[in-house]
């Protein structure tokens, strides 16, 4: 079997990792061994936070809906229960956007919910 010299593949692998570590501080962007660890850790953080982002945004939407519904005299839980009873199938993302951007439309929904709760 012929001898395999791995300089080309090693350099390519090192270059790939160092390119991913571009912008990191100090030796984290210059030294392969340290850059490799930094890139691995960055990947772990990215993986974790892609999942965490969903939780954070849902909490933000709930906070916004709660604030807007309290302006109309309803708590979040009563408002959401009223939506279910009124068969209004809007998700929290859309409701939160309405509460911030389109107050009259949100007020109309709140009025429908209030009518449904009273009945």
Swiss-Prot record:
UniProt similarity note: Belongs to the bacterial ribosomal protein bL20 family.
GO terms under cellular component: ribonucleoprotein complex; ribosome
Species: Janthinobacterium sp. (strain Marseille)
Molecular functions (GO terms): rRNA binding; structural constituent of ribosome
NCBIfam families (alphabetical): rplT_bact (TIGR01032)
Gene (UniProt): rplT
Record keywords: Ribonucleoprotein, Ribosomal protein, RNA-binding, rRNA-binding
PROSITE patterns according to UniProt: RIBOSOMAL_L20
CDD domains attached to this UniProt entry: Ribosomal_L20
Leader sequence segment: none
Function description: Binds directly to 23S ribosomal RNA and is necessary for the in vitro assembly process of the 50S ribosomal subunit. It is not involved in the protein synthesizing functions of that subunit.
Protein name in the entry: Large ribosomal subunit protein bL20
Pfam family, any one: Ribosomal_L20
Example GO biological process: ribosomal large subunit assembly
InterPro entries named in the record: Ribosomal_bL20 (IPR005813), RIBOSOMAL_L20_CS (IPR049946), Ribosomal_protein_bL20_C (IPR035566)
Domain of life: Bacteria
Keyword Ribonucleoprotein: yes
């Amino acid at each position: 079997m012929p001898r395999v010299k791995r300089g080309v593949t090693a350099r390519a692998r090192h270059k790939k990792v160092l390119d991913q570590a571009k912008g990191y501080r100090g030796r984290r962007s210059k030294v392969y061994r340290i850059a490799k660890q930094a890139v691995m850790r960055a990947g772990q953080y990215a993986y974790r936070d892609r999942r965490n982002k969903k939780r954070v945004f849902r909490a933000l939407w709930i906070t916004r809906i709660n604030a807007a519904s309290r302006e109309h005299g309803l708590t979040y839980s009563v408002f959401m229960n009223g939506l279910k009873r009124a068969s209004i199938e809007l998700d929290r993302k859309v409701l939160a956007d309405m509460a911030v951007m389109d107050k009259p439309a949100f007020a109309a929904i709140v009025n429908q919910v209030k009518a449904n709760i009273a009945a």
